[in-house]
Amino acid sequence: MKTVFVSGNFNVLHPGHLRLLRFAKELSDKLIVGVWSDRIAGKESHIPEDFRLEGIQSNGWVDEAFLLDESVEEVIRKLRPDIVVKGKEHEKSANPEAAILEEYGGKLLFSSGEVTFSSLDLIRNHIRELDHISINFPTEFANRHNVSKERLLEVLSKIDGVSVAVVGDLIVDEYVTCEPLGMSQEDASIVVTPIDSQRFLGGAGIVAAHASSLGAQAKFYSVIGDDDIGNFAMSELENSGVTPSVYIDPTRPTTLKQRFRADEKTLLRVSHLHQESIGSELRQIIKQEVHRSLPDTQVLIFSDFNYGCLPQELVTELIEAGQKNNVYMAADSQSSSQLGNVARFHDMHLLTPTEREARLSLRNQEDGLVVLGEKLSKHANAEHLFLKLGSEGMLLHARDDSNKKQTDRIPALNPHPRDVAGAGDSLLVLGALAIAVGASAWEAACLGSLAAAIQVSRIGNKPLRLDELQREFV
């Protein structure tokens, strides 16, 4: 494995740094970056060392980063990298690293990297940025159902400490930012060059991370492959405060969904996955682990992407176990093809399909939305049904205080979404948690819709925070 080492202050990750890191990564199998500690950097350190290290660790090209609290020469002697990369401006200066590298055959290279995009830091800021201005509170809907902001804040405060178990398909989402170069001369295809990439926890994993970030005690059950993507997912789960019971399936890779984007538009999506059901041994392990946790669990969430983690036999067994333990249950089953049947999650307290998923489940392309919702609710025996309609909002088919089913619509609360990925996950988890702690379906719909509006305000799946939701009530 070829290793490359880079070191520096990195007060601000400007485009020059990013080009240098990209150049270094292209030379290596493993890019290691040493960030000078406050002690070593001295007056050159304008930002605390922890923040500078975090900035480097967030870069998609960096495989390993650490605080460098000794001389660069000593670190090179310990690491023995194949190559050390420095900026072009150091080429005519004294470089004591050269003598050490020469001792064991290492190389010292100088480069700023190929200049491909001068505003990459702006892209990064754009990805992290959250646009609260475009989020609307559903005032008319709230008035129809006597939903007050004070009550919603009260519901949010009750989520703290709720015990949640999430079972489903773990996914890692990768956003590859590209610069378009033009049309190919050989065929009618667009030519791009990748200039940045960022990975996010997705699928059922982000559902568990949302729950934990909102204050719940989240346990997560799933499978991964024996690969770097799986290691990334495990690290993200643990950093989010989730307790993972995630098992390696040697027959499959960790599901990775790549989005290649340019100028804020997605050009292409590539999914690396196996859709076969998990084997009987893994199925038995997950069943036993979930069974063991259910007596102390208040909410059980199924997050199904039809990638094999939730075969019907396991689903049926877990539903029966949840009912025996009086656990509140919610489910979403996403169908990216003509496969999928959300109604297989029967007897749920909350079901959150899209219109397409509902029609696939019922094989019904004719009925209107209200009739469709009623039929699916009856077919799946769901207490509450949130039918997601994308930019048109959501249709609710839910029980009121008198135990009668009512239908209403809540509009989409963000008319200018930047990335719709993950909206359904945030709706599912906050809707389920809200109803589980005593909220009405209408209150849960308000909170879930606000969560979705926040999620689509930014690029990539990031765990929801309570303060983000509370800010919408100010």
Annotate each language-model stretch with its function:
Residues 1, 141-181:
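Positively charged, low-complexity intrinsically disordered leader regions
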Residues 1-144:
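Nucleotidyltransferase catalytic core that binds NTPs
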Residues 5-17, 167, 191-201, 308-309:
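Short, glycine-rich nucleotide/cofactor-binding loops
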Residues 14-29, 200-214, 319:
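Histidine-anchored nucleotide/phosphate-binding helix
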Residues 30-37, 87-88, 219-224, 329-333, ...:
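Short internal beta-strands
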Residues 172-301, 462-474:
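Conserved N-terminal subdomain of the carbohydrate kinase-like
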Residues 312-407:
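Conserved phosphate/ATP/ADP-binding segment of small-molecule kinases
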Residues 379, 383, 413-472:
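Conserved post-catalytic alpha-helical subdomain immediately downstream of the catalytic base
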